[in-house]
Amino acid sequence: MAITPTINSVHGRLRSVTDTDPGAQAEISETVPARRRWSIKSIFFHLVTDGTVANRHVSLIIDDGANDLWKITCSSAHPASCDTTYSFAQIAATEALVNCACFHPLPTLSLPAGARIRTATSLLKAGGE
């Protein structure tokens, strides 16, 4: 009999979730599957923008499927023609921008089934990924 972790189980495992590239003008959205609970340790993604002049601001949003539970908007603007790595982790103390990498603190999160992790980017233009 196979035992897999569920929200009623004391078992758990470290798992990396890799989504497909959402493509131009699309945002990231991951949903916790049914009968699962995710304990989030870190979130890591890239945003590549084209030459369209605009300062974009990236937000990371955690919701319960309908209502926002946690949201952070990066204070550092993401300019045109730029490839920036965004990293949210429990080890970061404050927001920092270092060599096209943006680091942000992440609270301890335990998400039930149906909860979502998603991004929202202001002024996302054609060619931005």
Model-derived features with residue positions:
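Beta-strand-centric surfaces of beta-sandwich/beta-rich domains
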Residues: 2-129
